[in-house]
């Protein structure tokens, strides 16, 4: 803090790259896709408008696998599959979905957003990942959970959740208490379950397999931007979500072989 008061977690706007892809795939699952749906992984050239060059997105390593499952596309972080999914979903759906999750405020409606071209913060992106492990509900980050006095009495609690029938002495032949919450349901619990399973595959077989030997049930996604300028890894267990970003304050390449899978 003595060197810089700038908070790179909450203030630095950077492109998330492939770390944004899980939200494209989650939206696809909300729109009648399944993890086994086949999507073409092949070259693609798109018009960007008059007086603009044709856009030709590429896969990392410039390899193509042909028709591939949605699960494999996320595990292997296939750019061309992701763009095709985005074309099918439509940009308005993608932009609205990202805004509901708090990732972006008003991003440009460009297909490149599906590959993480719009800028966000590490805090916003990590918070959005929490929705996967919370059944599709958006949980906003807080700094203070609760405050207790010297005798252990809670004098402040951030969450004011109502628990109906929690004061019952016995639960025999009675309804089990339910704790309500005020979290917004962004997508279905079924989608959250499927995406979590697919992101577990990223750790087991995909770009995050360097974490495979950690003795934890973990899911997550790597991210790398053009010229290896920004590298990311956002991961989570059932109890904790962690976001890692590596990059310079003044954007420049970290090196030819520096990726989210390696550096972050």
Residue map of PLM features:
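Predominant activation on well-ordered alpha-helical scaffold segments within soluble catalytic domains
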Residues: 25-26, 83, 95, 126-129, ...
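A glycine-rich, coil/turn loop motif that links secondary-structure elements
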Residues: 112-120
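Short pre-catalytic segments that frame enzyme active sites
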Residues: 1-20, 26-68, 76, 92-113, ...
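A penicillin-recognizing enzyme superfamily signal
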Residues: 1-8, 20, 72, 76, ...
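Short, solvent-exposed loop/turn segments at secondary-structure boundaries
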Residues: 40, 85, 255-258
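Structural motif corresponding to the C-terminal cap of alpha-helices
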Residues: 81, 102-105, 203-206
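A small/polar active-site loop signature that marks catalytic segments
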Residues: 79-99, 222
